[in-house]
A protein has these predicted regions:
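Nucleic-acid nuclease catalytic cores
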Residues: 52-134
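Alpha-helix boundary/capping residues
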Residues: 15-18, 96, 136
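Accessory terminal regions of nucleic-acid processing enzymes
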Residues: 141-151
Length: 151
């Protein structure tokens, strides 16, 4: 299955069924970004809405993710008008490595954000992911200690 401009009416119907007022959205604008996101996720056989969990203090949900042949892909779909940053996806990559005990130095990572008809793509430096992992671990230890002291 592939999402195309022909599916515009399905996108519009789904939005209307979910309470989005008709005049508020432009299905063509949404489809311009949504189609590549969906088609890439299908093409790369990615899992969607995947929870990445390190602890009760450090977790998130990736829109689309796959890990095959030591290649981690994380894709995010953005529909708003606020500026986007890759920081969230860097954190997701770090959470993935922590949860599945994967060394970022031993894998290739590709992060993509789909927004307003554009695809932003980065291949983060493993050292940056490692630094984020360390920060997550340290922050989690600190928060656990605080919670213990509150008891």
């Amino acid at each position: 299955m592939k999402l195309s401009k022909i599916d515009r009416h399905l996108v519009l119907l789904t939005l209307l069924e979910n309470g989005v007022p008709q005049g508020l959205i432009d299905a063509n604008d949404i489809l311009e970004t949504l189609a590549p996101f969906v088609n890439d996720a299908l093409g790369f056989r990615m899992e969607t809405e995947q929870v990445l969990y390190y602890s009760e203090n450090a977790f998130g949900t990736a829109d689309a993710i796959s890990f095959k042949n030591n290649f981690l892909r994380i894709h995010d779909y953005k529909s708003g008008i606020t500026p986007v940053h890759m920081d969230q996806l860097y954190i997701y990559a770090a959470l993935f490595c922590l949860e599945y005990v994967v060394k970022p130095e031993n894998i290739k990572i590709e992060l993509r954000i789909y927004k307003q008809g554009e695809v932003l793509c980065e291949e983060p430096d493993p050292e940056v992911i490692r630094a984020i992992m360390n920060k997550i671990v340290d922050s989690d230890k600190f928060l656990r200690k605080l919670k213990e002291e509150e008891r």
